[in-house]
């Protein structure tokens, strides 16, 4: 309910760019980047979050889009700023934790996570037991050092409906 799941259709982007001669004129990175940007912009039509969202994705996805080239070999996006402008986001952030994440929907289809658009102003962080913080300290005789550990438990959740977009690649053979 809080997250919009939107599939990226790479084959449709390949067909729209140049029909049957796409591979001769554009590289895979360009096709992939254009498919992601088109999906991101169409998904934003349903976005109900506040402000401008940021894009969180794997470092590999950022590299694929930055390495996209046109027919003459020139890069389409010269910097992360150009790429963020094309995606209509405030900033791009990399998250290695997204690598290999797969969601299985109600019909048992697999969707590989490509990235998440979210404005963290729509995300609320809280804690249990009034924000209880536990402190431990102990003297380590082997190293002649006093060691400290501070521990707390926190939780968080989106607080606005449709305030995040998860771009996914539908696939059943991962």
Label for each model-derived stretch:
Residues 54-68, 88-92, 133:
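Generic detector of multi-pass transmembrane helix bundles and their immediately adjacent loops
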Residues 71-174:
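Sequence/fold signature of self-assembling virion shell proteins
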Residues 25, 32, 36, 58, ...:
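Alpha-helix initiation/capping motif
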Residues 32-57, 66-79:
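Extended alpha-helical or coil "stalk/linker/tether" regions that are enriched in polar/charged
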Residues 1-20, 46-60, 134-160:
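Long, contiguous amphipathic alpha-helices that act as assembly "spine/axial" helices in icosahedral shell
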Residues 14-16, 39-40, 47, 65-68, ...:
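Generic hydrophobic, helix-prone segments enriched in Leu/Val/Ile
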